[in-house]
Amino acid sequence: MKRPLKLISASLLAALVSAVTAIPSFAADPFRSTNPRDIGSETQKAFVLMFKEGNYVAAVKQLDVAVKTEANEPLLFALRASTFYAKEDYLGMRVAGQRVRANAQALKGKDNLRAYVYLAASDLIEAGYIVKTEGVSSAARALPLVQSVFDNIKQAQDIDPIDPELNLIKGYIDMLIASVLPLSDLETALSSLKQYAAPDYLKWRGIALAYRDARKPELALDAVNKAIAAAPNNPELTYLKGQVLWMQGGNNIPTAKKQFELALTKAKQLNPSLLTEIREQCRNISGGVSCAE
């Protein structure tokens, strides 16, 4: 099975640089059930559209709405950075990352935990810009930024080590490190996600991705089912479940195809690149025949 690295990377970045139980309820912090932060309602709508509903097209439009009234929210520009990354506009990603940094700096003294979390996110975005525009040979130049990511995460942990927003971002970072360093222990890497991260639809999605990439489909299937329970209308999760079932093979292949076809019923809301990928994967599993939409 072909691994969709590009789109998975895009969705991971989106999650790194970033809930509620229903779209109409935007009064609550999308990460915390206690001690909620004052995250703008328009930004929260975009977050839920992107990650819970899997409606990338609507989320991009909602970000344009949010920026008019909530331009001081670092999460907003982290989400915008992820959309630029998805369409390979790395300069746009960098500019959005600079706004993440400026807004994070402005939070110092008001909400130091979120300030450090989004300073880490801005460093990660800048490091990504360097590697994407200058190639792997530039990785050494990005290393100080990577170290700064860890330093800022540690500063946030010193304030509240069990904060859900912090642990969601830290968990995805740990997971990515485990995926590129074979000697890393996956279960240790997933501990932040499993214990303290929220919301569930992003927490379990990350865990499912990690187990899928580690070729542990049974564990991946359990995790993606939990993500789907938290976000039953998200076609990206449906597609991920199809991938895991395809990996299991055998009698699961027809069910995997049905998951791909189910995801394609929401083609109009998907990231265009992801839509192309799902079509390709569904065609591959169907022996070269295009799937219905």
PLM region spans:
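Short coil/linker segments at helix-helix boundaries
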Residues: 29-30, 50, 54, 81-114, ...
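Terminal, low-structured helical/coil segments at or just beyond the last alpha-helical repeat
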Residues: 28-34, 201, 213-215, 219-222, ...
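Short coil loop/turn residues that delineate tetratricopeptide repeat
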Residues: 72, 106-113, 162, 195-202, ...
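TPR/TPR-like (Sel1-like) alpha-helical repeat modules
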Residues: 100-102, 144-150, 191, 197, ...
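Alpha-solenoid helical repeat scaffolds
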Residues: 44-45, 75-79, 113-118, 165-169, ...
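Eukaryotic tandem repeat interaction scaffolds
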Residues: 189-227
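Short coil/turn linkers that connect adjacent helices within long alpha-helical scaffolds
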Residues: 33, 67, 157, 228, ...
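N-terminal leader/linker segments that initiate helical-solenoid repeat arrays
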Residues: 2-7, 13, 17-87, 94, ...
